[in-house]
Amino acid sequence: MAKIKGQVKWFNESKGFGFITPADGSKDVFVHFSAIQGNGLKTLAEGQNVEFEIQDGQKGPAAVNVTAI
C-alpha cells in the first residue's frame, strides 16, 4: 500500500477517533486511535501532518499505519 500524506481535521481523545483530510483533496478518512503508530498516548492534534494508508473498514475507508511527520 502506498503511504498518503494528509492533515488531521479533528481528533476526539476521549472517544478515540477523528478524521484526516488527505493532501490530494479527496474525501476525509476516518482514523481510530488503534491505527496510530508509536509509543505512549495514541492521539493526534488538529492540523498535525501525518502519513497513512487506507483500508476498507466496516463503515467505509479508514486510515491505518498512521505516523506523524
Curated annotation (Swiss-Prot):
Domain CSD: 6-66
Stored InterPro entries: Cold_shock_CspA, Cold_shock_domain, CSD, CSD_CS, CSP_DNA-bd, NA-bd_OB-fold
Localization of this protein: Cytoplasm
SUPFAM superfamilies per the UniProt record, alphabetical: Nucleic acid-binding proteins
Protein's name according to its UniProt entry: Cold shock-like protein CspC
Record flagged with keyword Isomerase: no
Keyword Transcription found: yes
GO function terms (MF aspect): DNA binding
Cysteines joined through disulfide linkages: none
Record organism: Shigella flexneri
Keywords (A to Z) from UniProt: Activator, Cytoplasm, DNA-binding, Transcription, Transcription regulation
